[in-house]
């Protein structure tokens, strides 16, 4: 996969209360895949060579009628290949009643074309996703000498037509995309962060996230025995969470990450049989890093231990994931001198 990207933006303030932003972006994707099976299975989609241009234009108007209240209207137009999307508007509101507490709300139209992979493996039979999303929440932050914190809570609700969903076919040996006529997606996300610094270059930071996710199949029943309507989509956990802890001393860092995923069903009717569910699991990762600064570049090296406690788990039915494994990274960022 190769992608070329271009972007141009423009901003202008009209007084102290009105602000205009315009952005134009262009993506050119090139995808080439190879079927490396000794004998090609003609029942599966073959390797392909394809390309697509994606053009997106955005105009945003932001207005603050009062010091603690803001409103923004976004208008987006997209052209994918030779297909144009309808206008995609979004209305955003924010209110700061006191201190560093902000309430936010928005309503936005959704319209998403199938990706090149979606389109190919569905043999060009997919429809674009479309619908509306509503969300609202509150954010608060504060600070003291050498320390800072922040918390947020967000609720969202959406009805999406023609939801693009990948499902395991042929005994879970192949995944294929399809459209689900109507999906009701709603839930909540809570996050918190805290950071502290003390003498001699020491600092620490903790980030936590908890998500409650409901994605319900709301299409019309196919027949009287159809038990999939109103059920959670396969492989979508209702609960998930993550905690990341970073300890830093000068240019040395240690990161610990904990993830949790609740039970996930593998069938559309949420069958409770053994082969119809994937049990909850925890995941723990630990990494170490060191940064170096040179006149010609910034360099960072890292060592990571994935699945620290050698947990046995699956993310897909009958496909065990690796036990404890290790990784090494090297990142070089050149530092160009200006004349």
Positions of the model-derived regions?
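Face-selective signature of the C-terminal outer-membrane beta-barrel domain
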Residues: 1-85, 96, 152-155, 192-194, ...
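Outer-membrane beta-barrel signature, preferentially recognizing the C-terminal barrel domain
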Residues: 96, 102, 106-160, 167-197, ...
